[in-house]
A protein has these predicted regions:
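Conserved PLP-anchoring active-site segment centered on the Schiff-base-forming lysine
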Residues: 25-44
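Conserved PLP-dependent catalytic core of the aminotransferase class-I/II
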Residues: 101, 192-224
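Conserved N-terminal alpha-helix of the aminotransferase class I/II PLP-enzyme fold
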Residues: 1-17
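Active-site phosphate-binding strand-loop segment of PLP-dependent enzymes
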Residues: 58, 62-119
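Short, structured coil segments at secondary-structure junctions
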Residues: 32, 52-54, 144
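Active-site PLP attachment segment
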Residues: 137-172
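A short glycine-threonine-serine/GTX helix/turn-capping micro-motif
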Residues: 159-160, 177-186
Length: 224
């Protein structure tokens, strides 16, 4: 579908609310024997999802790839003993600080460690990347992101969000994300609105370019 193509993934599931989607997705992806490794300054939806996890979790210093690797070493040692899977979670663009996550560097760690990477790109979708496809597109590492979350509440100016991944993962999430199974889906009017906004983004980068023009003007004015 259009969203999957836009973020360069195989399939996509629409979600009724972004916060609930991230929390519920984390819950669905891991069980109590699995290990989570996550950035210390992750959004509340990630932190709450991690807190619900009944297994081991290791936190790394914000955007510190060296510390992330240290935690991966700990996680992999435990995984070897228990057969656990490892899920690494970070953000594409951190909303509270305004800095990009070290997504490309974390993807590179896959050459040494066996883990899946979940990226919350709520602030990157529509604003970063040559075509607005997000932080992974901006950093040239979209293929290395296993589970990609984007929201409709920022650049789309709507409600809801989506999760994109391999078709097998998305199919699993459709039947295991409790926030989607036991709640109403997005109203069709909002879905149509999101598709229209996506059409505008795909047709022209002018809205994104205008955003960065205004952002850079503000930064220059504040510095001066």
């Amino acid at each position: 579908n259009e969203l999957s193509e836009f973020v360069e993934k195989e399939d996509t599931i629409l979600c009724n609310f972004g916060y609930q989607a991230v929390l519920s997705c984390i819950d669905a992806l891991v069980d109590r024997k699995d290990v989570i490794v996550y950035d210390a300054e992750s959004h509340a939806c990630i932190l709450d999802g991690v807190r619900l996890h009944m297994g081991k979790r290791y936190v790394f210093k914000h955007n510190d790839v060296e510390d992330c690797e240290k935690q991966l070493i700990r996680a992999e040692k435990l995984a070897e003993e228990t057969g656990a899977a490892i899920l690494v979670i970070t953000e594409g663009a951190f909303g509270m600080r305004g800095d990009q996550g070290k997504v490309k560097e974390i993807v590179a760690l896959k050459e040494k460690y066996n883990f899946r990477l979940f990226v919350d790109d709520a602030h990157g979708i529509g604003t970063l990347g040559a075509k607005g496809g997000g932080t992974g597109q901006e950093q040239g590492c979209q293929d290395g992101i296993d589970i990609y979350f984007g929201t409709f509440a920022k650049s789309f100016a709507l409600i809801g969000g989506f999760i994109s991944s391999d078709a097998q993962v998305v199919e699993y999430l459709r039947y295991n994300m409790r926030s989607q199974i036991f709640a109403k889906s997005l109203p069709m009017t909002l879905v149509k609105g999101a598709l229209k906004r996506l059409e505008i983004m795909r047709r022209s980068t002018a809205p994104k370019d205008k955003l960065w023009e205004s952002t850079n003007a503000l930064k220059t004015g504040l510095v001066d």
